[in-house]
Amino acid sequence: MTRREFAFGAAALASAGCMSAGLEVKERNAADGIKVRFLGSGAAGWDPKWLKEKPNIRRPSSVLLDGRVLIDLTPPALDMLPEGCVPEVLFQTHSHGDHFNPVAAVKSGVKKVYVHESWVVAAREAVSAAAKKLSLPSPEVTGLAFAKSVEECGLKFTGVPANHSTSRVTDGVLECPSMYLVEKGVTRLLYATDTAGIPADAARMIGVDAHITAGNYAKYAKSGSFVAPPKALSAIIMEATNGDSDTDFRMFVHSSVQDVARTVEVLRSTGRYLPPSGQCAYITHLGLKYRDWPSGRIDAELPAGMRAAYDGLEVVFFNG
């Protein structure tokens, strides 16, 4: 199934809310929000061959931000890029094959690739080899330390640690998977996959640990330079690989729907997640539990304030 065959009607471009499609877009200036296109919303295990056989099949998880920046990319997701779109930058969460594919990175035409500094050498070698094989220009591959920020295409990216593992070791250094805080003006979006919950250090790096308040921030800042002052998130995209199971053996490296729901509620109740009225948190990286399920059926079983992403969905996230 190609992007041209992928029809979503009026819901294809909606506000990131649980209201009627397009309502928030009409009431807000889209230039102030972060536009997200889900190129893929599935976990590992979905067979690309299924794309031609039936609907509701998910490509490996990947997003396109503001039509210019990618987070993760694999060959099946290339077909979901809008017609004529040539992304400029690619941020990688980790090196698992359902997220990182050097051939896809080179074919996409991006000029820069960011990875965590722990595996930058391996990433450079892989991307360079793919470019040579394809006889195409090789993107520049840059290592990014946790809590350090870079600005690309009008968006600010901060890498923070994910609770995940690849077991990749390069020159004695263990790879550290990443999540990303994406900021545009006052809008703050957390893209969290793959991860089992939000690690404490990540929460402190993006200012959402409720232990830290305006009153005691100075004390925490002295103990660790990576600690950010308290600041609420505007939007959340988080993985729910384990579906509605809280006993899945992957619980140590992946999240469930309940994990995401608890995360959203705790952040909301502590003032660390303040979306606009009607704006939902989205789950992605869905496992085979949801094979053959349309997103509407998944949404019907999700807690209030949450929705399931699907391939080709476009939403615009705003600050509250």
Regions found by a protein language model. Give the residues of each.
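N-terminal export signals
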Residues: E5-E24
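Core dinuclear metal-dependent hydrolase active-site scaffold
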Residues: V25-C85, G143-P229, G312-G320
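Flexible, active-site-proximal loop/turn residues at the rims of small-molecule/cofactor binding pockets
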Residues: A12, H96, W119, N242, ...
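Structural beta-sheet core signal
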Residues: L90, L190-Y191, I283
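Active-site metal-binding motif and surrounding structural segment of the metallo-beta-lactamase
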Residues: R68, D72-V121, A232-I236
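Cap/insert and terminal regions of metallo-dependent hydrolase folds
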Residues: I198-L313
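Short, aromatic/basic amphipathic alpha-helical patches
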Residues: A123-L136, W293-G305
